[in-house]
């Protein structure tokens, strides 16, 4: 096979592999200002202190002179050509001052699960990754800086970190046995620590529609590391009804388009189409395209996250509708069977293509409106019924009150028959209430007192 044939074979293998690269960013280099308490490299004549109980590997690229230096108990200094340490009097550098000693910060502060410490090797302008996919996925190639020192914490150890390959100190590990032997060596112990484990395999993603990242089980650790500077809490979103895509730690403003695809769908081709034909028309938007698991159930779908980063909101919703229209027109050619979309603050409209588009949002809205109208009609019917019965009740009560007259007493007081010796008028006998008079049949309503019969009886 000639050189051209070998080149074509290599290109075909790369196309089939579809491996992504994740690059480790922070270092423990001596000249890195971020590694020092004063956020600068120690000046000449300063007092330098390394953590006594920490193991660390430090690359030194220049010559330095200090008045005093406290070294770690377990560590190494990798000196570049012409680099070294020497003694220098305190105050030799007038800009240094006689302040506190320069402290080398804790080298164990860097965690494998911190998304801020990784950079994607194939990132394009306008594209981003959800938080869980910023950490190496199981099909990624991991590259550590070959000419810099570093130290990585592998986590609590409940779940091993699994990637396709690890490149460190000029070596590429694709087998667990070789990687385990390196991690057990002194060079490995100085660069990797913690109870966690690191594994390689099973290989690159061979599915043109993409592969699930596989970091869902460790997402709580990823979010904890990401939100540690914020006290473990997400900042409030700048929009109502913010969205939280699969793999994201906090809510965001924008839209999410979910694609159900067929066997001919190619995620790289769709990502390139989005980047070339749509994103340039919507400045202030970033997109993330990846395969995720559809909840509930074991099935997968392609998630397109449109995040608004500009000052003018609403662009994500317009782009989501444009993507739905694109699926309605070109869905069969793209290998997309159906698409749905939702937007922060309001549902996104859709059209019909080779499958139901946006049926979830529209059906939910229609169901809510129908339920509200039904409740309103029931309330109106009950109110009308009460209004029609209330006057009849009041009129019936009034008729009952009028139909029961209050009868005046029929008796009278006769002063001729009053008892002798009484002065003044004889008090009237108290009359029983009307209800008792009406209900009594043995008591006469017309009577008077006869004193003659009263004396005879006496």
UniProtKB/Swiss-Prot annotation:
Name the cystine pairs: 43-96, 137-213, 205-211, 223-249, 234-250, 239-253
Q: Which residues lie on this side of the membrane: Cytoplasmic?
A: 388-458
Signal sequence segment: 1-19
Q: Where in the cell is it found?
A: Apical cell membrane; Cell membrane; Endosome membrane; Membrane, Coated pit
Among InterPro entries, the record links this protein to:
AMN
Q: Topology in the membrane?
A: Single-pass type I membrane protein
UniProt entry keywords in alphabetical sequence: Cell membrane, Coated pit, Disulfide bond, Endosome, Glycoprotein, Membrane, Protein transport, Secreted, Signal, Transmembrane, Transmembrane helix, Transport
PTM comment text: N-glycosylated. A soluble form arises by proteolytic removal of the membrane anchor.
Membrane-crossing residue ranges in chain numbering:
367-387
Q: Name one GO cellular component term.
A: extracellular region
Q: Name one GO biological process term.
A: protein localization
Instruction: Give the start-end ranges of region Disordered.
Output: 422-446
Which organs or tissues contain this protein? Detected in kidney (at protein level). Detected in kidney and ileum.
Q: What does this protein do?
A: Membrane-bound component of the endocytic receptor formed by AMN and CUBN. Required for normal CUBN glycosylation and trafficking to the cell surface. The complex formed by AMN and CUBN is required for efficient absorption of vitamin B12. Required for normal CUBN-mediated protein transport in the kidney.
The record's comment about this protein's domains reads:
The complex formed by AMN and CUBN is composed of a 400 Angstrom long stem and a globular crown region. The stem region is probably formed by AMN and the CUBN N-terminal region, including the EGF-like domains. The crown is probably formed by the CUBN CUB domains.
What is the protein name stated in its UniProt record? Protein amnionless
Which species?
Canis lupus familiaris (Dog)
Q: Which gene encodes it?
A: AMN
